[in-house]
Amino acid sequence: MRLWHEALIPQLPRPQLLGQHRECCALRGNGWGRKHATVDYVFTHSPYRLYAYHRLIMEEMAGRGYNVSPEWLDKNYRGKTCPPYQDLAEEKLNSPIYSEHDTAYYEECLANLREKGIELE
C-alpha cells in the first residue's frame, strides 16, 4: 500500500489507478490511523488532505471514463460501515498535497513501478 506521487497520477496504468482508488477508500474509512509503513505519514496530516488527494484520483478516473461512486466526492463520507465526519474542516493546500511527495519520493515511486515492469517518465 502506498500513495503514488501525485505527479504520476495522470500516467498510472489502469490497475494502479484503480488500486489507488481502493486504497484511498480504505484509508478514508476504517483504515484511518491503522499503522502501515508506507502510508503512516498520511495520518500526521488532516484527513482533508487524503480527501483532496483522493479527489485527484477520482478526477483522473472520470477523465478516463471510469464511474466513481458519487458518495466518495463528499469530503465527510468514509464508506458504508464507517460514520461520516460531521464537517471535515477544509484546508488551503499546496501542490503537492503531501510535502512528503518530494523529488526523492517521486524517484522511489518510479523505481517501485519499474519493479512491477511499468516504465514511466
Task: Show which residues each predicted segment covers.
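Expand to "…catalyze enediolate/carbanion chemistry for C-C bond making/breaking, isomerization
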Residues: M1-E121
